[in-house]
Design a protein with these regions (language model features):
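Internal alpha-helical scaffold of NAD(P)-dependent oxidoreductase catalytic cores
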Residues: 40, 93, 130, 136-208, ...
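Short, small-residue-biased leader/transition segments that mark boundaries at the very start
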Residues: 1-5
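NAD(P)+-binding Rossmann beta1-loop-alpha1 motif at the extreme N-terminus of oxidoreductases
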Residues: 6-53
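Short, hinge-like loop/turn segments at secondary-structure boundaries
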Residues: 47-50, 117-121, 161-165, 214-216
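Rossmann-like NAD(P)(H) cofactor-binding subdomain of soluble oxidoreductases
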Residues: 55-58, 63-156
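Conserved beta-strand termini and adjacent loop/short-helix elements that scaffold enzyme active sites
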Residues: 32-34, 51, 62-64, 147-149, ...
Length: 219
């Protein structure tokens, strides 16, 4: 299987942490990055500092998704406001069976997809999250897997990520089902040394994480 992680459009470090962990599995992994971070990973590999230990990972990295084949799994770990800026660049690597995992804080673009609210909000895009539905149109919500991110990490210098705590990436299908693809993604994360609980109502978890963000991010 092939997987790519779209990282570092803004000031992210979670994508690099994911890439380091998942590179320990048998997945064919590529990292999409840019600027000094991409250059450092190309030249020296990605260094992960965790629990006082430093480990280096040689990763395939590119700043042009067009150089990649169609992917089985795509992790998006850019800042939420940047997703609409990158969707055009991903279209060539999204295939019929591609799963897209949004490892991003905030309400996801697919939030009301198969939400079963019994109202006219079902399958409705949120304009404040996804103006004019651009993300919804380019990233088919049927391909989406929800992900709530708990690890904390930082880029201390280009190509170097320091893990500050947490290993849990909570996953869920928009319709709450326990699908085969959900299990496969969870198994991959677990094989990489991460925790990947599967939830039947991930929207509850999204709000719990948001309450935490609202309470503590200002401190």
């Amino acid at each position: 299987s092939e997987m790519c992680i779209r990282d570092r459009f803004g000031a992210g470090s979670i994508g690099g942490y994911l890439a380091a962990c998942l590179s320990k599995t048998n997945i064919d992994l590529s990292l999409i990055a840019r600027g000094p971070h991409k250059k450092a990973i190309e030249e020296n590999g990605l260094t992960l500092i965790k629990e006082g230990r430093s480990e280096n990972f040689k990763l395939k990295v590119t700043d042009d998704p067009k150089t990649l084949d169609v992917q089985d799994y795509i992790f998006i770990s850019v800042k939420a406001h940047a997703i609409s800026n990158i969707v055009d660049s991903l279209k060539n690597i999204i295939g019929e069976k591609t799963s897209i995992i949004s490892a991003v804080n905030g309400l996801p673009w697919w939030y009301f997809y198969k939400a079963n609210t019994g109202t006219n909000l079902d399958n409705h895009h949120i304009d404040s999250v996804d103006p004019e539905g651009k993300i919804w149109k380019h990233l088919d919500p049927a391909k989406a897997i929800g992900c709530v991110v708990y690890p904390a990490a930082e880029i201390t210098e280009p190509g170097v990520i320091k893990h500050n705590g947490g290993e849990r990436f909570t996953l869920g299908e928009p319709d709450g089902s326990k699908s085969e693809r959900l299990k496969l993604i969870a198994d991959l994360l677990i094989a990489g040394g991460l925790k990947a609980p599967q939830k039947s109502n991930l929207r509850d978890e999204i709000w719990i994480k948001l309450w935490g963000n609202c309470s503590f991010n200002i401190i």
